[in-house]
Amino acid sequence: MKVTFEQLKAAFNRVLISRGVDSETADACAEMFARTTESGVYSHGVNRFPRFIQQLDNGDIIPDAEAKRITTLGAIEQWDAQRSIGNLTAKKMMDRAIELAADHGIGLVALRNANHWMRGGSYGWQAAEKGYIGICWTNSIAVMPPWGAKECRIGTNPLIVAIPSTPITMVDMSMSMFSYGMLEVNRLAGRQLPVDGGFDDEGNLTKEPGVIEKNRRILPMGYWKGSGMSIVLDMIATLLSDGASVAEVTQDNSDEYGVSQIFIAIEVDKLIDGATRDAKLQRIMDYITTAERADENQAIRLPGHEFTTLLAENRRNGITVDDSVWAKIQAL
């Protein structure tokens, strides 16, 4: 089915208000969920909203909590999210990293006791729109087996790197081949994954999203490489925030809350003039996209450029929402 941005935001806002969230906070949170969905990231927008409300109802998310600064060390700050709403707090933390970068050339905010930030790419994009390089990542509950194991002991720990090119170039990737949100998107659409995304119950690689969702044997990106990246990202976020590791979040909490996150902004224009920056970025992009195609019908993609197209299409044609997901939201 198709809905407008306004219908989507109103549906989110209604549910949040019904849970006692104050009107200003509800409006800002609903706006972020709707913008994420409008950008084409359904897995962490409309599809994720019922799960967000479940955690709100369970008390994992504290809607009136405010993040608190703990430590300042020049360009580095440490904050405690105090289990506030994840996407609103993450936006605030990247804003703060940008402010620090304006003063120091680089800004880093380490956040502990945070909730799921929904679409991590929103915060990298936020920095790139203002002309900064944006880098951020989060740890999570253990939902992926380390390479060589059957049990989930590491997080998908998504990493975002956004570059202020025209259009914005951005990598937004979990350390698994697919996020669990993308497994759900493909399952709801009745599609197999385009490449192997995990193991079946017999230990064979599979493209069946429903099988992987059920047995939780999701495949690390690049096999042992994604496994290793997940581990070191967790270690850095834990140390810089003085927060909880994947092990602590998984073993000590009843659900995925109290995670640790990193937000970095770099002011490129302190190191290179704008015209030179743009020319260098354009040459990189042109060199890549003019390579001989393996398939004449498939353009060579640059990471994140599809979001500009998806946003324009959704604004023109309306936002596609799965019927079953919309029914869940209407029932909340």
UniProtKB/Swiss-Prot annotation:
MF-aspect GO terms: 3-dehydro-L-gulonate 2-dehydrogenase activity; NAD+ binding
A Gene Ontology cellular-component term: cytoplasm
Matches recorded under InterPro entries: Diketo_gul_Rdtase, Mal/L-sulf/L-lact_DH-like_ah, Mal/L-sulf/L-lact_DH-like_NADP, Mal/L-sulfo/L-lacto_DH-like_sf, Malate/L-lactate_DH-like
Chemical reaction(s) catalysed: 3-dehydro-L-gulonate + NAD(+) = 2,3-dioxo-L-gulonate + NADH + H(+); 3-dehydro-L-gulonate + NADP(+) = 2,3-dioxo-L-gulonate + NADPH + H(+)
Swiss-Prot/TrEMBL keywords: Cytoplasm, NAD, Oxidoreductase
Enzyme Commission no: 1.1.1.130
Short name of any one Pfam family annotated for the protein: Ldh_2
Keyword Metal-binding: no
Annotated binding of NAD(+), by residue: I168, T169, M170, V171, D172, M173, S174, W224, K225, G304, H305, E306
Domain of life: Bacteria
Entry's localization field: Cytoplasm
UniProt keyword Ribonucleoprotein present: no
Active-site residue numbers: H44 (proton donor)
SUPFAM superfamilies in the record: L-sulfolactate dehydrogenase-like (SSF89733)
Subunit relationships: Homodimer.
Stored NCBIfam families: PRK13260.1 (NF009750)
Family annotation (PANTHER family): 2,3-DIKETO-L-GULONATE REDUCTASE (PTHR11091:SF3), OXIDOREDUCTASE-RELATED (PTHR11091)
Record-stated family: Belongs to the LDH2/MDH2 oxidoreductase family. DlgD subfamily.
Function of the protein: Catalyzes the reduction of 2,3-diketo-L-gulonate in the presence of NADH, to form 3-keto-L-gulonate.
Name this protein carries in UniProt: 2,3-diketo-L-gulonate reductase
Phylogenetic lineage: Bacteria, Pseudomonadati, Pseudomonadota, Gammaproteobacteria, Enterobacterales
Primary gene name: dlgD
